[in-house]
Regions:
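Conserved, mostly hydrophobic/aromatic
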Residues: 122, 131, 212, 248, ...
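Aromatic-rich peripheral "rim/lid" segments of glycoside hydrolase catalytic domains that contact
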Residues: 1-12, 16, 27, 256-268, ...
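Alpha-helical scaffolding within the catalytic cores
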Residues: 22-31, 64-68, 115-119, 181-204, ...
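Active-site clefts of carbohydrate-active enzymes
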Residues: 88-90, 139, 143, 173-184, ...
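Active-site groove signature of glycoside hydrolases
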Residues: 116-148, 172-174, 284
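N-terminal substrate-binding region of glycoside hydrolase catalytic domains
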Residues: 1-112, 132, 136-138, 213, ...
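Active-site neighborhood of glycoside hydrolase catalytic domains
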Residues: 148-175, 181-184, 199-209, 235-241
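Aromatic- and acid-rich polysaccharide-binding/catalytic face
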Residues: 41-45, 126-129, 133-135, 173-175, ...
Length: 340
């Protein structure tokens, strides 16, 4: 892109490119629609371990998928934020797609080599302004405290490599805020206080954290959007003078399972973020533009041999779009547009 949205001082708004249905038509239409309602696309792909362990350059389906996403984004004048994801997005306690005989640890030299090469490939091919090296890493650190330091050392190595080639790249990891803020009951983590964030997990990455980025899906915690405390997100700004970002998140608008939420709750959620973090955010991702058809996704996941529990978990996120499955706007879309 000739001019990057990230050159301006105002917040950039974006989405993760999950189409309402798993079809090519749905994908092409989504990129057109994201260009109307956003500035960038979140490119958050897992690691092609077997390809990247062999070197920075190479050809594989996963690499091609990323190239195609960026091509579509640029055709629609959308910028991109990259997050490289070693973990299973629906269960961040585990790696995603690691070859069967590989040790599941960030101490594994093959894991480290592949992840480094992936980062360098992205930097050299796409020159991203924002490069995330993990998503919701605190959930992995909680589950595997003995491996946390191995990941942090890998992060610092990649940070130095990328800065040597592209010093303007802003490098970060994301933290799952609702978990960091201790609003889920997790007795296995000891006597942590609700609304008292585990800052030590964030600060373990300093001084090499260029952005403090969070994800948040508070409908898992609060009965309504109005229940989000007025100081739920603002502690971030009291703790750091670094730029902050909302790297993914959403609020469900439909009653399902144990949830009883409505479109008004989604409006309250957007307003809470805007009021509490507002102009301090360099970018803000509402994970979905459109709700998605969970049957279409479950079928695709089954064909890939994914764990059926992953499809059930994914269903919890089906109604966080700013528009319904067919593109009908929800009340929150006008609120989102008013912020932009």
């Amino acid at each position: 892109l000739e001019e990057s949205v990230f050159d301006s001082t105002s917040t950039a708004y974006g989405f993760y490119p999950s189409p309402p249905e798993i079809t090519f038509e749905s994908v092409f239409q989504l990129f057109k629609d994201m260009a109307i309602h956003g500035d960038f696309v979140l490119v958050q792909q897992n690691v092609d371990w077997e390809s990247f362990v062999l070197g920075v350059d190479g050809v594989s389906q996963k690499r091609t998928d990323i190239i195609n996403q960026i091509t579509l984004a640029r055709q629609n004048n959308l910028d991109a934020v990259f997050v490289l994801d070693a973990l299973n997005g629906l269960n961040r306690r585990e790696f995603d797609g690691l070859p069967a005989n590989w040790e599941t640890s960030f101490a594994n030299p093959d894991v480290r080599t592949a992840f480094k090469n992936y980062a360098l490939w992205v930097v050299r091919n796409f020159q991203p302004r924002y490069l995330g090296l993990a998503s919701e890493i605190n959930t992995y650190m909680d589950a595997h405290p003995n491996d946390a330091q191995n990941f942090i050392s890998l992060y610092n190595e990649i940070y130095a490599l990328v800065k040597a080639e592209a010093p303007e790249t802003q490098i970060f990891v994301t933290f799952q805020w609702d978990d960091l803020n201790n609003v889920f009951p997790q007795p296995e983590e000891g006597d942590r206080q609700r609304f008292s964030p585990n800052w030590e997990q964030v600060e373990a990455f300093e001084p090499n954290l260029d952005v403090w980025a969070i994800s948040s899906y508070p409908y898992f915690v609060f009965q309504s959007g109005a229940d989000i405390p007025t100081d739920y997100y603002s502690p971030l700004l009291e703790r750091t003078s670094k730029p902050v970002a909302f790297a993914e998140g959403g609020f469900s608008t439909q009653a399902f399972a144990e949830f009883t939420h409505s479109p008004e709750d989604q409006v309250a959620y957007l307003n809470a973020i805007h009021v509490q973090l507002g102009p301090h955010m360099v970018f803000w991702v509402n994970t979905l533009l459109n709700d998605f058809n969970i049957d279409s996704y479950a079928k695709e996941m089954a064909s890939q041999g994914r764990n059926p529990e992953d499809a059930q978990m994914l269903a919890n996120f089906a109604y966080i779009g700013l528009r319904e499955f067919d593109g009908t706007p929800k009340p929150a879309l006008a609120v989102w547009e008013s912020f932009r």
